[in-house]
Amino acid sequence: MKFNSNDRIFISIFLGLAIIYTFPLLTHQSFFVDDLGRSLYGGLGWSGNGRPLSDFIFYIINFGTPIIDASPLPLMLGIVILALALSCIREKLFGDDYITASLCFMMILANPFFIENLSYRYDSLTMCMSVAISIISSYVAYQYKPINIIISSILTIAFLSLYQAALNTYAIFLLAFIISDVVKKNSISNITKNTASSVAGLIVGYFAYSYFIAKRLVTGSYNIEHSKIIEINSSLFEGIISNVLSFYRMFSTILNGDNYLIYYSLFFALIISLIVIVLKAIKRDENKKTKLLLVVLILLASMFFIIGPMIFLKSPIYAPRVLIGMGGFMFFCCLCVFYAFEDKQLISRIYFSFILLISTIFSYGAYNAINAQFQLEESIVNRISQDIDYLGFGRDKKNIKFIGTEPYAPINENIVIKHPLMRELIPRIINNDWMWSEVLMQRNVFSRNYRLYDKEVKLENGWKKSGNNVYDIGVVGETIVVRFN
């Protein structure tokens, strides 16, 4: 592919918007959950999650292990790779309108759930790469040729080996290519052949990945449990309903926040736009019923792939980072608005810019809240270390037990009420027996020798040696106990 002047302008605009959107992360990125361990030990460990290509990439760019913390370079590289991938499909979807293309494609990053993905100092690279490759894979397969199916299958194996949740992005961009062909009066037969080709590329790649990679590399009880498919028996329907309700509870955090009108407006705009697209197609086309049915199916599919195949997992991970599909859905809504109201570009751009502005304000609040919480955690660990030293029982005790969860930083107490999603985005590391509590302690030079005690302890009278308004501290047997108030 050759880049023309429009591609270069598009990349410049998109990167400019992306830098503004992620500016707090580019200037000061906190250590986000897994980052704690990787920055401390320098290990890889993605292969056990079924993500061997992530291991390979970081092994290569670090010339082996231990890997180093090069933040914010991984995030910057991830955004650049995403921009290059999007430039490959810009012309097909938007023609020469690189300004609207930039605004619409930014919805992938403006996805409020994607904030968690971008917050990782290491994974931000491979997660952005996974999204980028999934888009290219979908595009390559949507050109009916046997060789394209093979290439798409290889790319599918690649993006699944980086981050499996990007599968939903593949599917939603397939829907984008279909609606593009509907608008451009492509024949039903060509649309059907291209769609079948894209689906074939995904299926072949997925099963190859599942058999040759996931089946052989996924290890550890946590990873194995979360990769199991619901068994086909009497509880199948019940399991699917349970997953749908659980994901809806996660999704509803944005509908219950102060920015809810943004997401309702996008859905409303999608419905109106698809109606307009259908009416235009009916006026000019012979296959009226077929086009109508196709658009209805596209609408339902676009909503399904916010969650996608994860509803069929026995124990899916309910976390913002897996809802990458929401960014694809937001993009798809904007694309349909663009197609339905091509003669009103200025109004569409203003609407897209407004969504992006509100999303940027929300993301800045999230990044600052995550940073404030991490600073509080470091302060708590420092204070615990001082208490242990002052009380004099640290030299002969090697185990530490946490009971309860650290409080929110004072500046976060209001934001989690204003925006319920913040409760999911702001990690509270010191949380009972969570393994990252131990890693956080080991990052502090004064408490690095303590190991987390994950068995139950019985608190009896006299166990408490000291306390403050955040926690009580004392000893039970050979274990230091910290109980949060």
UniProtKB/Swiss-Prot annotation:
It holds the Pfam family Glucos_trans_II. It is a multi-pass membrane protein. Signal peptide: none annotated. It comes from the Viruses. GO terms for cellular component: host cell membrane; membrane. Coiled coil: none annotated. It is found in: Host membrane. Keywords: Host membrane, Membrane, Transmembrane, Transmembrane helix. The chain crosses the membrane at residues 9-29, 66-86, 98-118, 131-151, 159-179, 194-214, 259-279, 293-313, 322-342, 350-370. This is Uncharacterized 55.3 kDa protein in gtrB 5'region. It comes from Salmonella phage P22 (Bacteriophage P22).
